[in-house]
Amino acid sequence: MSFVHLHVHTQYSILDGQSAISDLFARAKELEMPALAITDHGNMYGVKEFLKVAKKFPEVKPIIGCEIYVTRHYDHRLKDKDHRGYYHLILLAKNHNGYKNLMKIVSTGHIEGKYYDRPRVKHEIVEQYSKDLICCSACIAGEIPKAIIAGDMEAAEKAVMWHKRVFGEDYYLEVQQHKTLIPGQSQEVYEHQLVANEGIYELAVKTGTKVVATNDVHFVRKEDGPAHDRLICLTTNAYLTDTDRMRYTQQEYLKSEEEMLDMFYKHPETLSNTLEVAEKIEVFKVDKDPILPKFDLPEEFLADIDTYLERYKDIIDEGRCDKSGNERGEEFCRSVAYLCHLTYQGAQWRYGEQMTEEQAERIEFELKTICKMGFPDYFLIVQDFIAAARSEGISVGPGRGSAAGSAVAYCLKITNIDPIKYDLLFERFLNPDRINMPDVDIDFDDDGRYRVFQYIEEKYGKEQISHVITYGTMAAKSAIKDVARVSRMSIEESNRLTKLIPDKPIVQMEDAEDPFNEGDTLEEGQKLIEKEVEIDDPDNPGGKIKVKKQFKKYKKEVSYKPKLKNCYKLIPELKEELANGSDEVKDVLNYAQKLEGCVRQTGVHACAMIIGRSNLTEYIPICVANDKLTGEEVWVSQYDGHYIEEVGMLKMDFLGLRTLSIIKE
């Protein structure tokens, strides 16, 4: 037998889960588990990182899921105290279509049903997007366990039958068992779980539903429990010494198969059923080639489209098919023709009626490259909103970064720097050998930047536009301060410890060695040493021999980030505190290191915006945030800027440049 954890919270269950994704996979591999799920609370923030880390652990199949919140009433859009209640429910994607449906459910919760920070959906939304999803009944906050604990077996059975009707053989009842071993701590959770489990086993027999054992994982190893307890104190603004605060049982870690079997020895099938679930899951990719928005061409241009298609046939033919040989279609060809039309119009304005041979060849080369790589609409979109900005009197920067190397961008007035005159390379901006999305950073005056946002939203529609999420993590100093606060350490002592943490990298002089080759000379401070090294035996293929070689030994500067691990090793005062400080100081420093790097909050990127081809919830999970200027809710991607382009989305950076505002004023 083996076992798979299907109910797992990472640190993206913000200030509730402590597990680093890489640590989860490493532990799952160590325990020889064939798969591992991610089921964070109401979000998919960590999915891309989860899949990225999974590539390093091919033995462990990644399972994408979410613990969603389902309203107890008929409409998740009702937001008042009488409609605040919700249930927990686990959903797991069987394949890519299931992943898309999961994104729809999670996004709907954030866009329509968010209340008191809980993104809720009604049962009808779950049913609407249920295809290719596996469903588990969740913890004692789930609908079925709650009904059982309340003594309403009729309601529990009714809920089971609803879920079986919706999910069929992909619905599983879920049991958990967390008996705390902490002296003096209440066993209320465990007692409720025992009641719920008894009812679940009864309903499983009565309704023919399989049961899976889970452990509601919130941290990786048993010894991480006290650190997680401090994290919960941060979440609830409590002190460790508070008697009536929220507590976990400290049993919510990634337990081994043996530990799970010890709890569910009377029902070993609950472990083997997790393997059945894992076997239903396909390994699939969520990354895509670029999915650019469709740029609507003007009617007057389309009226004579055949002429333009013929005129620019050579350039169009360069990219008529994608890298797999698939036809890109008529819309693509029309976009290329319009891009060529605008570029050559702009070239006349920039260079005059008669271009030099160098100018003509450069523009044709760039257009063919843009067409071959499939990016004509990108340039059309950028030139459109820059032209709109200028027409509204918004100051636009001359161009920065590698985009200044594009003659096409110069002709389209995206930039105001002639790359031919200044001998700038186009290949730094766009290179056929590296299929990356173009990246044009555009400067606007501060007020104008927001007006450009508005223009794009009006042109493409609110459902195709999104801001980009950011994640704030606990840095070294804040981790010490946070742990010190919940430990009731004095402010003076907390400040004393944090002042020992440098703001800049720690620079050390360390020994280094390099081979000393014939013709080399020793510089000041270097000395020559001789060492025995192992090399390939030229007379014995596959064999090794030892020879003596010369090396130059010297001191070099090595820079370390001021993370707590490095600080404790390299800063004498902190080494002394860890060795001989008070128990309180040692606890604070040790637990701060365990919490350092945990995700603490989300934010919205100040400059980045996503423009999609259609409703963005078809491609990425969405959450919402309040616009700082208007107070209105805006869409925000649940994947951050590192991953947005990997899933095919067009991300643009609109930079507010104070200098432009000053010049304008």
Describe the residue ranges of each PLM region:
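Alpha-helical scaffold/interaction cores of sigma-54-like transcription cofactors
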Residues: 1-665
